[in-house]
Amino acid sequence: MNPNQKLFALSGVAIALSVLNLLIGISNVGLNVSLHLKGEGVKQENNLTCTTITQNNTTVVENTYVNNTTIINKGTNLKAPNYLLLNKSLCSVEGWVVIAKDNAIRFGESEQIIVTREPYVSCDPSGCKMYALHQGTTIRNKHSNGTIHDRTTFRGLISTPLGTPPTVSNSDFICVGWSSTSCHDGVGRMTICIQGNNDNATATVYYNRRLTTTIKTWAKNILRTQESECVCYNGTCAVVMTDGPASSQAYTKIMYFHKGLIIKEEPLRGSARHIEECSCYGHDQKVSCVCRDNWQGANRPIIEIDMSTLEHTSRCVCTGVLTDTSRPGDKPNGDCSNPITGSPGAPGVKGFGFLNGDNTWLGRTISPRSRSGFEMLKIPNAETDPNSRIIERQEIVDNSNWSGYSGSFIDCWDEANECYNPCFYVELIRGRPEEAKYVWWTSNSLIALCGSPVSVGSGSFPDGAQIQYFS
């Protein structure tokens, strides 16, 4: 075969291959169009299904490989989030188990751990996080000197993964302030921070990270809020705020927000005399708050909020088992309407309880005089029966170790339970004032626990840092 004949033969083969490739491409286009139209014709009542078609050099259709074809990926859109409805009761609890412990002070001996106080835990549909008010410094930083002070211009709210000590790299800044609360309504998160001078403070309100409104002091004496999570029902979030003296009559409001905007506010009603730092939880379309009386009572005041009517009432926990600190000895009879006084009495500490009839649990420091140790007490009908007594006790932190604030939280999005499992945290304060011999700073670690439906073992879970290592 001469060169010209070879050339014509090769050209003919090339043309034939090109035509074949073109025919395959046309068939692929037809297949893609038919699949696309078929996908559009499917109607679903709840979730929308979309088909994404990507054309590459090889097509895979039902595991059959064809030249130059398409990969078909299907994805399903999730349902839109819904508002939390608080339609469950509290679970029955037989004991408490630790779900997180961040050991922040132990890590802080060598790591750059942020100085915090007033920590709490709050959950949303994706999980739970720790929130805390930082002091604008780390433990080993010289600026940690003087962080015993509660209200400075350097403070702000941060969040970190629950169980992880707060560092600059893992902390998420939320807002500026020295008092805070935060809660999720099922669709978005509302946060309140309070900033400014003691006699002229301002509360800033955020919804999904955007500033929505501000609230100016109404009594010009340290406007303050819960220092733990608020609670939402059907898009409305209830928050307890106080302004006025810490050791005499103050002015408390229950405020209701929708997407960060005030829709109603009520002055405190009922027999409670003094309200600060409420620990609130939701159940049965209600919000129950166990608070701090910094003025007179060692029995804790409580607020009950009906979220369907947006109205509340207040009184005291009825039992004679006292749970504030400082406190006198337990009484044989309690009082549902009046503060129980005695020496030592004031000033108090943030605390909590779960008021659930026969399955009522109250938390308190073990020491009646100082913030040391922590225990959980099962006291059936403590919220209604002045003669109720302790039937079960579980030690959380032994009395030779420091504790601090404590508060309640609930993961309302835990679909594994047909009820709301009560949870709480304990702040483990280290440094000044109790350990001023060794350090100039004040900070904390945190431990979080949740209820168990069966009885549990025993154990103490203190902060555990050797404070002399910081000298």
Curated annotation (Swiss-Prot):
Keyword Hydrolase attached: yes
Bilayer topology reads:
Single-pass type II membrane protein
> EC number(s) on record?
3.2.1.18
- Tell me what controls its activity: Inhibited by the neuraminidase inhibitors zanamivir (Relenza) and oseltamivir (Tamiflu). These drugs interfere with the release of progeny virus from infected cells and are effective against all influenza strains. Resistance to neuraminidase inhibitors is quite rare.
Q: Which residues lie on this side of the membrane: Virion surface?
A: 28-471
Task: Show the segment(s) annotated as Hypervariable stalk region.
Answer: 36-87
What coarse category fits the chief subcellular location reported for this protein?
Answer: virion
User: How is the subunit organization of this protein annotated in UniProt?
Assistant: Homotetramer.
Q: What is known of its domains?
A: Intact N-terminus is essential for virion morphogenesis. Possesses two apical sorting signals, one in the ectodomain, which is likely to be a glycan, and the other in the transmembrane domain. The transmembrane domain also plays a role in lipid raft association.
This chain's protein is named Neuraminidase
